[in-house]
A protein has these predicted regions:
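Structural marker of alpha-solenoid helical repeat scaffolds
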Residues: 138, 172-178, 212, 246, ...
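Canonical tetratricopeptide repeat
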Residues: 148, 181, 188, 222, ...
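Beta-strand-rich binding/interaction modules
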Residues: 13-42, 66-69
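TPR-adjacent "capping" and linker segments in tetratricopeptide-repeat scaffold/adaptor proteins
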Residues: 90-112, 176-180, 294-307
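TPR alpha-solenoid repeat register
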Residues: 145, 178-179, 185, 219, ...
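Residue-level recognition of tetratricopeptide repeat
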Residues: 116-117, 151, 191, 225, ...
C-alpha cells in the first residue's frame, strides 16, 4: 500500500519520504528517538505526488537511534522502520553445495527432498525426476515420490503414465480403508480422469479429495465445473458454496458462481459475484467481460490473441462453450491467429477454420 524511506546525512539532517499506491489523505509520519517523538507530520500522498521532508536531528545522532513510523487515517500503524548496521566481520552463512547425485544420497527422505527442492527452485543442471526415480528404485511404493512423478507427468499431458504413478501412491495411502491425510495424489488423479472424460470416476475421486482441507476448495471447484457443463446448476452451486467457504479468495469459483447465477436469471446475484472479484482483482478478465461494455473490454484486452484464448478456455472449462466461441470469434474477426482458428474449429466442429 505504501513505501517510506529515512536517511540521515553527516550534518545531522534527516530526510523522510513516503509514497502510496493510491491517493491517501490523513496519514501521519513520525520519527522517534528512544521512544520520544522528534518529528511528526500529517500528510497526503498519491503515486504522482510523493511526500518528502527533512529535519535536524542534531549532531552526533546515528540513524540506528531513530525509528520512522507511518500511521494510517485511523491512527493504526502501517509500517515502522529502524535502520540496522550489519557487522561485516560476521562470517557469511554456510555456502549451498551442489546436490549429491541421487545414488550417493544415503536415505530416501533426503533424496526425495532434494528432488522436491529442485522442483521449487529451478536448477537447469539438476533434474528432479532423477531423484524421485532413485527413491522408487529403492522403494517402488513410496507415496511421496510416486505423487510427484504423477504430478510431473500430468502437467506434461502424459495422463496414462501420470495415473499409474498416482494410483501407486494412493494404494499405500489407503491401505486398511484409510482416508489419506494428504490428498495431493487423489486430487491430481481426479484432474486426469476429468480431462480424459471419465466423469463418473472423476466425480468419485474429486469428492474423496474434498475431505482434505488443502484440496477442498480446488476439488469442489472442479466438481462444480463438471456439474455446470452438464447443466446441473443447483448441484454446481452447492459445490461452489463449499469451495468459497474454504477459500474466500477462490476467484475462479466466485466467477463460476456468477456465470451460473446469470444463466439462472439472477443478474443481481451474478453482478455481486463479479464485483466481489474485481474488488480484489481489478484486472480479472472474466469478471471484466461480464461487467464492461464490449468496446471497453476490447480496449482492456489490447487485441492480444493469447489473452482471448486463455479466457475462452476458462469459459469452456466452466461449461459455457457458447461464450468461449463468441470470445474467439470476436478476436478472429480482427486478428489472424492460427491457434484461435484451431480452437474455433474444435469448439464448433467446423472445418472451415482449418482451411
Amino acid at each position: 500500500d505504501a513505501a517510506m524511506n529515512m536517511e540521515i546525512g553527516e550534518d545531522g539532517k534527516v530526510m523522510v519520504a513516503v509514497n502510496a499506491t493510491s491517493r491517501r489523505q490523513g496519514l501521519r509520519v513520525e520519527v522517534s528517538r528512544a521512544g520520544a517523538p522528534v518529528y511528526s507530520k500529517t500528510i497526503s500522498v498519491a503515486p504522482d505526488s510523493p511526500f518528502r521532508d527533512s529535519f535536524d536531528a542534531g549532531k552526533g545522532v546515528e540513524d540506528v537511534e531513530l525509528t520512522m513510523t507511518l500511521y494510517n487515517e485511523k491512527g493504526g500503524v502501517m509500517y515502522t522502520y529502524t535502520p540496522v548496521h550489519h557487522d561485516t566481520s560476521t562470517p557469511l552463512p554456510e555456502i549451498v553445495d551442489r546436490p549429491k547425485r541421487p545414488k550417493d544420497i544415503a536415505n530416501t527422505e533426503e533424496c526425495y527432498l532434494v528432488g522436491l527442492r529442485n522442483l521449487q527452485f529451478y536448477n537447469p543442471f539438476v533434474n528432479p525426476v532423477d531423484y524421485f526415480e532413485e527413491v522408487l528404485r529403492r522403494d517402488p511404493g513410496d507415496t511421496r515420490a510416486n505423487t510427484q512423478m504423477g504430478v510431473y507427468y500430468r502437467i506434461r499431458g502424459d495422463y496414462e503414465k501420470a495415473a499409474g504413478y498416482l494410483r501407486t501412491a494412493i494404494r499405500r495411502q489407503t491401505k486398511d480403508y484409510t482416508r489419506p491425510k494428504d490428498a495431493e495424489a487423489i486430487y491430481n488423479l481426479g484432474l486426469i480422469l476429468k480431462a480424459q472424460g471419465n466423469i463418473p470416476a472423476a466425480i468419485d475421486t474429486l469428492f474423496r479429495a474434498t475431505w482434505n482441507y488443502t484440496y477442498n476448495s480446488g476439488a469442489n471447484t472442479q466438481l462444480a465445473q463438471i456439474y455446470s457443463e452438464a447443466g446441473m446448476y443447483d448441484e454446481a452451486l452447492e459445490r461452489l458454496e463449499e469451495a468459497i467457504d474454504y477459500n474466500g479468495r477462490n476467484y475462479q469459483a466466485i466467477n463460476l458462481k456468477g456465470l451460473i447465477l446469470k444463466a439462472k436469471g439472477d443478474r443481481k446475484g451474478a453482478a455481486e459475484c463479479f464485483s466481489e472479484v474485481l474488488e480484489d482483482d481489478p484486472v480479472n478478465a472474466l469478471a471484466l467481460r461480464e461487467t464492461l461494455s464490449p468496446a471497453d473490454f476490447r480496449e482492456f484486452m489490447r487485441e492480444a490473441p493469447e489473452s482471448y484464448l486463455e479466457l475462452a478456455i476458462l469459459y469452456r472449462n466452466n461449461g459455457f462453450s457458447d461464450d468461449a466461441v463468441e470470445i474467439l470469434k470476436d478476436i478472429d474477426s480482427r486478428v489472424d491467429y492460427p491457434t484461435v482458428k484451431m480452437w474455433l474449429g474444435y469448439l464448433t466442429g467446423s472445418y472451415k477454420y482449418y482451411e
